[in-house]
C-alpha cells in the first residue's frame, strides 16, 4: 500500500516536471513583441554590387538573365565596379599620352556600363572605376596587360608612389570618365575633344576600392587623392555625392577612419558625404561545410562590433557623414587559391548559398538597428577563377541563386522608414526582428542560423503570410504560404518574413 502511494506520488511529480519543461520549452520558442515601443526608425537600403567581368558582356549566356534580375529588383544604391583583373574592361586610358596623341578608349567599357545604367534606370547608382592606370605610378616595370579582354590578370597593379604625388593626374582621369558619362564627353590632356553623347545621372561616385590592398595606399595618401578627385569631379557634376575609404579590412585600420573623418585633414570645402567598407566571412582551410554555420555567424558578430566602433568614430568626428557597407558576403577558402597553377574549383554545396544568404540577412537587419545607410550584398556574378563562391547568380546561365532571392525578399519587405520595434527572443540559433513598415504592416524577420529546423511561436501570426527562402526553394523565387496558426516552421538556414494579418 505504502509502495503504491509512493509510486503514485512520483508519477504526479514526474507529470508536473514534464509539464513545466514543456511549458518552458514553449515559452523559449515564443517571441515577445512590443508593437507600441519603437526602438529605431530604419534608414537602411538593401542592395548589391555589380563587378565587371566577362560573363556580363553582351552575347554571353549570363548577360540577359543577370541584368533582368537587377532590373526586377528595383534597388537603389547599386554599386558598379570595373576593376583590376580586366584592364581593357575597366581602365579607359591604358597608355600615357605620347607623340602628340592620347589613348582614351571606351570601346569595350561603354557597352557594359551602359547596360548597367539601363538596368538600374530610375534608381540611384554608385560608380567606382576603381583601377588607376598603372602608368600613373612610379615603377621600373612597364604596364602590361593581355590583348584578350576576357583574360584575368592579377599583376596589372604594382608600385606605390604616384608619379604626380599631388594626385591631380589621377583626379583629372576620374573627372574625365565622369564627364564622359554625364556631360557628353571631355577634353583630353592635349586639348582634344572626345564626344560620347552620354548624359546619364551619376548621383554617387566612390573614390578607389580597397586602397590598403591596391597599391597599399595609406590614409594620408588616400585622403590626398580623394580631395583632388572630388574637387575635380564636383566641377564636372556638382550634384554628385562621394564615398570615401572603401576598406577591405576595416577592423585592421582604425587610424584610416580617424584620419579621413577629421575635417582638418582635408582641403576646405571638400565634402565627406559617405564612408564605405566591406565584410566577407572566410572559413579556414580545414573547416568543413558543416562547421561554417558556426564560424560565419561568429565572424559576422565580430564585424558588427567593428561597425559599432567605426560609428563611434564617425559620430565624434563627422556626424553628418553617412555610412555604406557595400560589400557583404562570404568567400570560400578554395577561392583564395584560385590563382594557383592547375587549380580546379571545388563543387559548392547547395546549402552554402542558403548559409551565405542567411548571414547577409542577419547583417542587414543588425545594420538597420545600428543606423547604417546601405547594406550591399556582393556580388552579382562570380565564376570559376573569379570568386565563384561570391556569386549571386548561376554562372552558367545568369539566373539568381538563393543569395539573390534573399536580397529580393529583404528589399521587397523592409526599407527606410520602417519602425523597428522592441523584440525579445531568447533562442540564439534563431534571430528575430519585428518592424512596422512605412505603410503600416506588421512584419517579423526570422533567420535560422543553423542547418536544422526550428518551430517558433509568433503571437498574432495566424491568418498572416510567411514568405521564405530555404533549401526547399533552391534557385527559385521566395515561396509563400498562409499561416493557419501562430506556429512558424523554419527549415535549415531559412530566411523568413512573417506578415501579420
Briefly describe each language-model feature range.
Residues 8-19:
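Bacterial N-terminal signal peptides
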Residues 25-76:
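Mature N-terminal, pre-catalytic/accessory segment of carbohydrate-active enzymes
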Residues 56-70, 254-265, 357-364:
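Short, acidic/polar
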Residues 73-296:
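Substrate-binding cleft and catalytic face of glycoside hydrolase catalytic domains
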Residues 282-339, 398-399:
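Glycoside hydrolase catalytic-domain groove-lining segments
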Residues 325-414, 418-431:
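Aromatic/acidic polysaccharide-binding cleft in carbohydrate-active enzymes
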Residues 426-462, 469-471, 493-497:
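Carbohydrate-binding surface patches
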Residues 479-501:
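C-terminal beta-strand-rich structural cap/linker in extracellular carbohydrate-active enzymes
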Amino acid at each position: 500500500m505504502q509502495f503504491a502511494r509512493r509510486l503514485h506520488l512520483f508519477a504526479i511529480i514526474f507529470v508536473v516536471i514534464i509539464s513545466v519543461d514543456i511549458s518552458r520549452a514553449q515559452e523559449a520558442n515564443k517571441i515577445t513583441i512590443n508593437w507600441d515601443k519603437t526602438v529605431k526608425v530604419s534608414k537602411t537600403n538593401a542592395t548589391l554590387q555589380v563587378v565587371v567581368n566577362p560573363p556580363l558582356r553582351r552575347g554571353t549566356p549570363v548577360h540577359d538573365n543577370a541584368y533582368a534580375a537587377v532590373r526586377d529588383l528595383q534597388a537603389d544604391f547599386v554599386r558598379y565596379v570595373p576593376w583590376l583583373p580586366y584592364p581593357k574592361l575597366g581602365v579607359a586610358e591604358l597608355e600615357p599620352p605620347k607623340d602628340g596623341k592620347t589613348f582614351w578608349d571606351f570601346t569595350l567599357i561603354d557597352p557594359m556600363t551602359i547596360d548597367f545604367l539601363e538596368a538600374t534606370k530610375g534608381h540611384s547608382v554608385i560608380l567606382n572605376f576603381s583601377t588607376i592606370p598603372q602608368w600613373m605610378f612610379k615603377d621600373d616595370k612597364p604596364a602590361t596587360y593581355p590583348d584578350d579582354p576576357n583574360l584575368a590578370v592579377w599583376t596589372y597593379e604594382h608600385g606605390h608612389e604616384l608619379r604626380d604625388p599631388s594626385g591631380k593626374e589621377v583626379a583629372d582621369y576620374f573627372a574625365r570618365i565622369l564627364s564622359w558619362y554625364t556631360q557628353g564627353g571631355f577634353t583630353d590632356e592635349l586639348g582634344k575633344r572626345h564626344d560620347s553623347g552620354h548624359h546619364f545621372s551619376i548621383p554617387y561616385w566612390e573614390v578607389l576600392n580597397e586602397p590598403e590592398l591596391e597599391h597599399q595606399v595609406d590614409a594620408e595618401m588616400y585622403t590626398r587623392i580623394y580631395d583632388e578627385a572630388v574637387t575635380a569631379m564636383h566641377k564636372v557634376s556638382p550634384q554628385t555625392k562621394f564615398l570615401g575609404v572603401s576598406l577591405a579590412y576595416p577592423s585592421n585600420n582604425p587610424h584610416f577612419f580617424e584620419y579621413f573623418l577629421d575635417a582638418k585633414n582635408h582641403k576646405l570645402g571638400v565634402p565627406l558625404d559617405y564612408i564605405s567598407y566591406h565584410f566577407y566571412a572566410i572559413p579556414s582551410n580545414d573547416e568543413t561545410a558543416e562547421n561554417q554555420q558556426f564560424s560565419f555567424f561568429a565572424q559576422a558578430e565580430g564585424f558588427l562590433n567593428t561597425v559599432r566602433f567605426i560609428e563611434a568614430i564617425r559620430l565624434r568626428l563627422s556626424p553628418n557623414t553617412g555610412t555604406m557597407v557595400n560589400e557583404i558576403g562570404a568567400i570560400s577558402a578554395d577561392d583564395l587559391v584560385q590563382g594557383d597553377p592547375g587549380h580546379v574549383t571545388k563543387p559548392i554545396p547547395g546549402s552554402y548559398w542558403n548559409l551565405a544568404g542567411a548571414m547577409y540577412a542577419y547583417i542587414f537587419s543588425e545594420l538597420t538597428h545600428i543606423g547604417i545607410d546601405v547594406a550591399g550584398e556582393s556580388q552579382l556574378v562570380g565564376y570559376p577563377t573569379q570568386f565563384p563562391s561570391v556569386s549571386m547568380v548561376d554562372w552558367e546561365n545568369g539566373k539568381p541563386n538563393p543569395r539573390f532571392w534573399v536580397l529580393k525578399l529583404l528589399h521587397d519587405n523592409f526599407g527606410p522608414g520602417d519602425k523597428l520595434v522592441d523584440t525579445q527572443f531568447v533562442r540564439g540559433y534563431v534571430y528575430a526582428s519585428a518592424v512596422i513598415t512605412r505603410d503600416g504592416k506588421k512584419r517579423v524577420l526570422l533567420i535560422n542560423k543553423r542547418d536544422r529546423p526550428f518551430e517558433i511561436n509568433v503571437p498574432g501570426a495566424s491568418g498572416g503570410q510567411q514568405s521564405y527562402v530555404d533549401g526547399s526553394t533552391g534557385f527559385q523565387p521566395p515561396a509563400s504560404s498562409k499561416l493557419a496558426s501562430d506556429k512558424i516552421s523554419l527549415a535549415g538556414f531559412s530566411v523568413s518574413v512573417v506578415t501579420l494579418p
